[in-house]
Amino acid sequence: MKKTLLGSLILLAFAGNVQAADNPNPETKGKVTFYGKVVENTCKVKSGNRDMSVVLNDVGKAHLSQKGYTAMPTPFTITLEGCNANTGTKPKANKVGVYFYSWNNADKENSYTLKSTLTGTDKADNVNIQIFQENGTDAIGVADKTIDDFTHKNNGSTNSDKPTKNHISSATALNNQTGDIALHYIAQYYATGMASAGKGPTSVDFPIAYG
């Protein structure tokens, strides 16, 4: 009898906790809605571009003596291949490019440039790498894990399936292209302060992105 009563009390307590969890204060709960789309016409990164190196020429530290100074713009190209046309009714992309991101190397405090991965005495202090679109005037902000350009917050009951900012770099119209697509970019040194002599390697990841 005692065991039965004890079990009943435990069940009642558990049920009460579940009910409290199901009906929390509105200010202590929320919901995240995720949007996405899979498209029919897709491309591949050309094999020689999947793990590539871009070498900037040496530069004198006097050219990078103050924050915001830049030097040695260097072009590089990422080539896509194997793009398949979509002539049917399935969802298709109208443009293609790449999305630059780095959870470790993006420097939020310095225009989302790329900070050096080197440590020790060989490192060039206060020197980052900045990426530009092909025109050389539109800087590409490398996305990091704090960026919220994909998130709509406090917008009432209406959600949006579009990001607040476009992060598809060098977006090129697909138009059912099946050949190679060359995406052109520019990399350059970017001073975050008075530069010192040394090396400044860094890296960035990119998946293909569609729009």
Swiss-Prot record:
Protein name, please?
Major fimbrial subunit
Q: Which gene encodes it?
A: hifA
Please give the organism.
Haemophilus influenzae
Question: What keywords were assigned to this record?
Answer: Disulfide bond, Fimbrium, Signal
The record, for InterPro entries, names: Adhesion_dom_fimbrial (IPR000259), Adhesion_dom_fimbrial_sf (IPR036937), Adhesion_dom_sf (IPR008966), Bact_Fimbrial_Adh_Pro (IPR050263)
Stored PANTHER family:
FIMBRIAL SUBUNIT ELFA, FIMBRIAL SUBUNIT ELFA-RELATED
What functional role does this protein have? Mediates adherence to oropharyngeal epithelial cells. Helps the airway colonization process.
- Indicate yes or no for the key word Signal: yes
Renumbered to this chain, the signal peptide range is 1-20
Gene3D superfamilies linked: Fimbrial-type adhesion domain (2.60.40.1090)
Q: Does the keyword Metal-binding apply?
A: no
For this chain, the annotated S-S bridges are 43-83
GO annotations of cellular component type: pilus
UniProt similarity note? Belongs to the fimbrial protein family.
